[in-house]
């Protein structure tokens, strides 16, 4: 987020080993342009080949999602390492998906998780914008989509919302 020279370098296996980490889930952040789900999957496969357990998420902060197969559901269904999707909400760097787009996305993730037997998570980078995770809590309250598919992050600045979300299930 400061030019090409500030790009985050690729993760190194030695960092996991020296930290005692045995399982990783890789994901893309803001930069879904110079990095891609394909490159992330290649790194995930390399880590698995090096002896650590590694999974990854398709997409980055953006909506519509950038995938390998053309759909989030197919990425989850047909690529063993992919267990869900990354997305940003409530952030100046997000694509501001609508409620209906979020419902459609998490529904696709849910169906893929049911068919594949995978967890099927929507990993949500939550920024500092005022709406916070209210759109997600509204979806949980007003649909039959289980809360277990939503994984919001960066909630330290939103402790009351985090508490409400936790009590929802």
Question: What residue ranges belong to the model's regions?
Answer:
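Hydrophobic faces of well-ordered beta-strands that scaffold small-molecule active sites
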Residues: 1, 24-26, 54-58, 81-89, ...
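Generic detector of short, locally flexible boundary/turn motifs and exposed helical patches
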Residues: 19-23, 50-55, 86-91, 114-120, ...
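Active-site-adjacent beta->alpha loops and helix N-cap segments on the catalytic face
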Residues: 33-41, 65, 95-106, 131-135, ...
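Alpha-helical scaffold segments that flank or form the walls of functional sites
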Residues: 2-56, 68-80, 100-111
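Active-site gating/metal-coordination segments in enzymes
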Residues: 64-121, 153-155
């Amino acid at each position: 987020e400061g030019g090409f020279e500030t790009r985050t370098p690729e993760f190194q296996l030695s960092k996991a080993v020296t930290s005692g980490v045995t399982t990783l889930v890789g994901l893309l952040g803001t930069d879904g342009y110079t990095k891609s789900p394909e490159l992330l999957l290649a790194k995930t496969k390399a880590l698995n080949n090096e002896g650590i357990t590694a999974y990854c998420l398709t997409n980055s902060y953006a909506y519509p999602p950038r995938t390998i197969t053309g759909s989030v559901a197919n990425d989850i269904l047909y690529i063993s390492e992919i267990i869900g999707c990354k997305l940003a909400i409530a952030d100046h760097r997000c694509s501001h998906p609508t409620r209906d787009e979020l419902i459609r996305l998490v529904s696709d993730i849910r169906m893929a998780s049911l068919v594949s037997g995978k967890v099927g998570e929507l990993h949500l980078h939550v920024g500092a914008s005022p709406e916070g995770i209210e759109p997600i809590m509204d979806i949980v309250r007003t649909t039959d989509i289980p809360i277990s598919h939503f994984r919001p992050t960066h909630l330290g600045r939103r402790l009351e919302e985090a508490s409400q979300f936790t009590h929802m299930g």
